[in-house]
Amino acid sequence: MIPLEHPILLESFAHIDRSVGPHNLSSQEYAIARRVIHSTADFDFLHLLRFAPDLPQAEFDPDLPEHQAIARGIESLRHGQTIVVDVNMVKQGIQGLVQRTFNNPIQTAIDFATIADPGKTRTETGMDRCIAQFPEAIYVIGNAPTALLTLCQAIAAGKAKPALVIGVPVGFIGVLEAKKALSLLPCPQIRVEGNKGGSPVAAGIVNALLMLAWREG
């Protein structure tokens, strides 16, 4: 197995572990949170990440991750599922590790729209087109709340059934509304509560899932 983690990264993880100390996250949840903390130097994410929906107790399997979101993410990455991201910064943050692991195709929504449709942003327009072509992809939104709202509306209308939604846009306009819309959907999802988020957070979550999938593969 090719080495995927640089010694400096592992040293940073050890520093984070010492700073965090005891916590209530599962090992897989913590692996994701730690990667996000490493990407942002912000320990608040330990408490802001949400993984949903939980598996029903009747379906509990001790050999599966606790959360359907993590399980679906790992399974989908292993099977080469397309990853749709909202902006190029997210793509740049994940493509190196994607190429060294499962080589999933990466599509960027904003590249699907050189001109925005009337009344929409370019990212929103591009997201519409990605949904039509890749309704079951892994969707990763790190920047544009309008893109996340567009995706949520498509899911609610039955036009999209993503393998996983990573919804972590950042900012003050439309962000809380978009995250709330995602939280009300039954689809597998990883999101960040509040105004924090961003492309480094989105990329960190994907990279953590890639490492979990690679190690357990």
Swiss-Prot record:
Keywords noted in UniProt: Cobalamin biosynthesis, Isomerase
Active site: 38 (proton donor/acceptor)
Enzyme nomenclature, EC number: 5.4.99.60
Molecular function as annotated in GO: cobalt-precorrin-8 methylmutase activity; precorrin-8X methylmutase activity
Subunit: Homodimer.
Function description: Catalyzes the conversion of cobalt-precorrin-8 to cobyrinate.
Protein's UniProt name: Cobalt-precorrin-8 methylmutase
